[in-house]
Amino acid sequence: MTSGGTPRVALVTAREALALDEDLPPLRDALAAQGVDVDLPCWDDASVDWASFDIAVLRSTWDYAERIGEFLEWADRCACLTRLANPVETVRWNTDKRYLLELSQAGVPVVPTRFVSPGADASMELMRFLDGGAGSLTFGHADGFTDFVVKPVIGAASRDAARYARVDGTAALAHLARLLETGRQTMLQPYLDRVDAHGETAVIFFDGALSHSVRKGPLLKRGARLVSGLFAPERITPREIGEAERGVAVATLRAIPFGVPLYARVDLIQGDHGAPVVLELELTEPSLFLAQAAGSAERLAAAIIARSRD
């Protein structure tokens, strides 16, 4: 704590993200309004004294996926010096999308997925996935689909993710083979095309309490170029959720094996029959769309202050 007894908070970002993260200004202002000493350090800045903070809150560390080993080593070190939110064990679990299998095993409805490991025969794996028979998916069941998605298990902001038509197997195979050849765990998923009309629903929680929800426009278009920047531009608008979406989002939060996170974002889309299914659970560095909900920055600031004093 500072000499006045107020906490010192780090909102952790990355150099390229500092000017792009639209959540940072309102959150910084909400904390400062409570007398909190706020800094915006970059996670890989070796000059930062992490022990001088009462809590370090991961915000826009959006370059972590290309430096995952370095990032997790930093998180381990940081957690030894101060409170890290979300905690390092949560971050380690959440940065690998195989957590989706655990959610599915806990009874949470999740987009059907096939995981593919480096060393596997890319052509055979893709053929099995598209055949749709027994064993075609690691978990879940998919009715007939026309498009599908190839993406890395460790990735952020749709980077290296692409949508393909079933008839475009050559391009999809090249993408899958490239990811596997570079040693990256990869995932194949049916593209649930209701998202084109309905979009995604992002449900945001602070300290286990529902804060707000938004609609995210569909990101992956057939034949689009891979995302090259830190994140893909998104069309965001407020959205009220129904009981079905709320139920799935809460069930997802309860399935996290490491206790209640400071912040969480559950991304939902409509399945084949319109019921909500989990696309992703974001516990590391999600955009929280604070500008879309009055009072959300103040709610998160209050949760941060409370955690800093635990």
For each feature predicted by the language model, list its residue ranges.
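Active-site nucleotide/adenylate-binding loops and adjacent lid/helix of ATP-dependent enzymes
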Residues: 2, 7-13, 75-80, 89-198, ...
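Conserved N-proximal alpha/beta basic substrate-recognition cap immediately N-terminal to
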Residues: 5-8, 15-121
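Short, solvent-exposed loop/turn segments at secondary-structure junctions
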Residues: 16, 63, 155-156, 193-194, ...
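Short, solvent-exposed loop/turn elements at beta->coil junctions and helix N-caps
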Residues: 44-46, 189-194, 266-269
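Short strand-connecting beta-turns/loops that link adjacent beta-strands
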Residues: 155, 208, 273-274
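Phosphate-binding site of ATP-dependent enzymes
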Residues: 165-256, 277
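ATP-dependent carboxylate activation and anion-phosphoryl transfer catalytic cores
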Residues: 241-310
